[in-house]
């Protein structure tokens, strides 16, 4: 991700199992679940995202960012892409 780049809010759906794992590998990034504070991602940070949790992830405003993203196998798994993270939401991150 280039500085300031982030994906839209999205959900990794599954009726059993599922979800996603993120591992920070370079730079500085963010992960946020809807209604919760953002979590900083640095190299070595591991984030487990349960199935059916609305979230987003991306780079910090002043840093390139890279992560490995792994889909966790689940039953009836699918992804739902939602609205963009607004500049107002993103600009609150420190």
Regions found by a protein language model. Give the residues of each.
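Feature marks short, surface-exposed loop/turn motifs that line or immediately flank catalytic pockets
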Residues: 5, 15, 74-76
């Amino acid at each position: 991700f280039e500085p300031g780049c982030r994906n839209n809010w999205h959900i990794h759906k599954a009726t059993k199992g599922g979800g996603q794992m993120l591992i920070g590998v370079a730079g500085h990034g963010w992960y946020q679940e809807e209604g919760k504070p953002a979590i900083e991602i640095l190299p070595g940070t591991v984030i487990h995202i349960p199935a059916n949790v609305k979230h987003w992830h991306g780079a910090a405003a002043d840093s390139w960012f890279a992560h490995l993203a792994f889909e966790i196998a689940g039953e009836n798994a699918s992804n739902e892409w939602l609205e963009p993270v607004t500049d107002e939401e993103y600009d609150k991150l420190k």
